[in-house]
Amino acid sequence: MGKPLIALGLEGSANKLGVGIILHDTNGSAKILANVRHTYITPPGQGFLPSDTAKHHRAWIIPLIKQAFAEAKISFKDIDCICFTKGPGIGAPLNSVALCARMLSLIHKKPLVAVNHCIGHIEMGREITGAQNPVVLYVSGGNTQVIAYSEKKYRIFGETLDIAIGNCLDRFARIIGLSNAPSPGYNIMQEAKKGKRFIELPYTVKGMDCSFSGLLSGVEAAATELLDPKNPSSVTKQDLCYSLQETGFAMLVEITERAMAHIRADSVLIVGGVGCNERLQQMMAEMSSDRGADVFSTDERFCIDNGIMIAQAGLLAYKTGDRCAVAESTITQRYRTDDVYISWRD
């Protein structure tokens, strides 16, 4: 029968630093013991620099680990493995977290497991929602991919050809001076709810791939022209946020539906930070309803980057014998989803 296994997960691929502790019982069920997070937030109009983000992670990771262990009511002797994000992500923050994982592994003599960030999102989403074999729409600040599992890999059926949808939303939020707290995308969503006019913007879909740079350029040009005080236009920034969301999300729904039709899938799972967006969830639900399919998503505890998803995916890999030697515990900024061998699925 074995014994329950416990993993510590460390995530820091962008401006969110997360620490999670998960327990897998002997029957395979998962229990979240702790899931804590701290976000590096910059002033309105500014993004986050890699060096500053890494400094934030170095300052907060030990306090967060202590908080996680206090919530879980366990100690390092109870941990079976330490899981960390190998990539994809921003180099300096990734390195800061990987360095901490190495240090903890050596001090406490616990094995390391390197985890792909996207696989973490998928496996946590599957665990929380119960989705068995969905088409996955992975949407975040750095990634936009349509994914499905086949023959021991999560295959990418479509993706952005340039910038991610989250990056598009974040950059427009900076252009119009929205706050970065709690996140630019959240504030875009709130402004979009007040929008009343739809402004036509560039729409670029190529098969199951899409492009958001033209959309960003288009909405930026519209903002410069229509929001000019000298322009008599009655268009508001709320209208532009609404139009940006409707256009970008329609592109995402189209490529997701095309992938579902291609592989005859009966469900879709939305993961990643942008997956929290209520309008995206609504549009995906309408499409899925028309197809007689199910749509799954999670709340902000699991959509937004977190440590528990790294612990979940890492522990699944650990149980099939996956280990990462300290000497090989490097990071890979462009770590492709389909580069990972999925040993724990049939």
Swiss-Prot record:
Cofactors (names): a divalent metal cation
Cofactor: how bound: Binds 1 divalent metal cation per subunit.
Pfam families assigned to the protein according to its UniProt record, in alphabetical order: TsaD
CDD domains: ASKHA_NBD_OSGEP_like_euk
Compartment(s) of residence: Cytoplasm; Nucleus
Main location per the UniProt record: cytoplasm
Keywords, sorted A to Z: Activator, Acyltransferase, Cytoplasm, Metal-binding, Nucleus, Transcription, Transcription regulation, Transferase, tRNA processing
Residues the record lists as binding a divalent metal cation: 117, 121, 138, 305
Example GO molecular function: metal ion binding
Described purpose of this protein according to its UniProt entry: Component of the EKC/KEOPS complex that is required for the formation of a threonylcarbamoyl group on adenosine at position 37 (t(6)A37) in tRNAs that read codons beginning with adenine. The complex is probably involved in the transfer of the threonylcarbamoyl moiety of threonylcarbamoyl-AMP (TC-AMP) to the N6 group of A37. Pgp2 likely plays a direct catalytic role in this reaction, but requires other protein(s) of the complex to fulfill this activity. The EKC/KEOPS complex also promotes both telomere uncapping and telomere elongation.
HAMAP family for this protein: Kae1
Family: Belongs to the KAE1 / TsaD family.
Stated name of the protein: tRNA N6-adenosine threonylcarbamoyltransferase
Organism: Schizosaccharomyces pombe (strain 972 / ATCC 24843)
Organism taxonomic ancestry: Eukaryota, Fungi, Dikarya, Ascomycota, Taphrinomycotina
